[in-house]
Amino acid sequence: MPYQDLIVGHKSMKNPDVIEFAGDYSLRDMLLINHEGEAIDIKYLVQEINVYESIYNNSITGTVVITDATNLINNLPIQGTERLAFKLKTPGTDKQQHIIDCSEKTGFPVNIFKLTHRQQLDEGVQMYILHFCSREFLRNMRTRVSKSYSGTLDTMVNAILGDKDGLDSRKTITTQKTRNSDKIVIPNKRPFDAVDMLCKRAMADNSKSVGYHFYETTKGYQFRSWESMCVDDKGIKR
């Protein structure tokens, strides 16, 4: 996986079940939800969606390019507390690995944290870019971990991510078991920094290697050894 992997790009315009160009996607709907819970479907304002994930980033991020002839951002001002709920897939397939689910019913909506590149295209028409991130990214900026943990490092990671008073992640967390147990004091660190600290100490249960990666994909969080990322699905080294 490259440093920053672009997951999707341009919306499939003609036939939502046929791929015409690389990066095409089929978008079911896209709801912009404000802090009061009011939702507006902005699907037809969307020109482009970009979702980024990386083994070097603890959270997914993304952008939505909007062409707005409805005066949306004045009628529903962007204050940094809004959420985006959407579900998109690769045209022509319903396989789970080709679906990005950020819907309210079955997935996890993302949070808008910035609006940039606002420009007037025509009278009554403007374009701008909405920047979004996962909910945990914002909670990580607002919370700290000051606590001692004991046991295997993979259980510590699960405890840090699921702490109701901290990161409070509800997403799938896939952890590779570690063979080393320890008692560790986290000295007032942000949750992601605490997990990154554990990554440097973690030793895989089924190998002699040291060092883990912690990152988020569109399917959830991963805490796994470097060595496990260098094998194929059958466990054979590449």
Feature map (PLM): residue ranges:
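Glycine-rich, acidic and aromatic/proline-enriched surface loops and short helix-turn segments
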Residues: V125-R139, S150-I173
